[in-house]
Amino acid sequence: MWDKLEKGPIIMIGLADGRSHSEPLTAQLDRDQVDTIWFFIGKDNRLAKGGAAMAQFVSKGQDFFACLSGRVAVDNNPAMIDKLWSKPVEAWFPGGKTDPNLALLRFSIDEAELWEADMSLTGKLKLLFGGKIRADEEGSHAVVSDTLV
């Protein structure tokens, strides 16, 4: 999943409170933390209040899909801000790493449901021209609820 996120890092994420809509944010990845995705947001962003959250991701090639659940919280760890900081992030925060509106949001993933459309050639032809796709011609699916390594 991390390779797919690096190629197209936009994730739809929102609070799982039944009142908020998801919004597109750019994922900041730290491969040392396989159960965490980071986002730079404004302190005035609705996600800054934290809580249970859901995120959805579709890869750039539209062959990989993920639905993630967990919790979001602001975590303005200066070392992590330094590690994840980039020119594209700086474009959103003119005050740099000390911008008064800057917040680093941690999304701690509790569970992930993943689908990969690694369909066989025969399955792709059936999609194109019609026909029933058998189980061995479908992609793969997994539910991951323990991300500890």
What are these regions (language model features)?
Residues T98-V149:
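C-terminal edge-of-domain segments
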Residues N45-L47, L121-T122:
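Short, surface-exposed beta-strand-loop junctions and turns on beta-sheet-rich folds
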Residues Q33-I37:
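Short active-site oxyanion
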Residues D3-S20, A53-F57:
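A short, Trp-centered hydrophobic/proline-enriched beta-strand micro-motif
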Residues M1-I10, V143-V149:
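N-terminal leader/targeting segments and the immediate start of mature chains
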Residues F40-G42:
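Short His-Asn-centered micro-motif
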Residues L47-E111:
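Short, structured beta-strand-loop surface elements
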Residues S20-T26, W38:
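A positional/architectural concept
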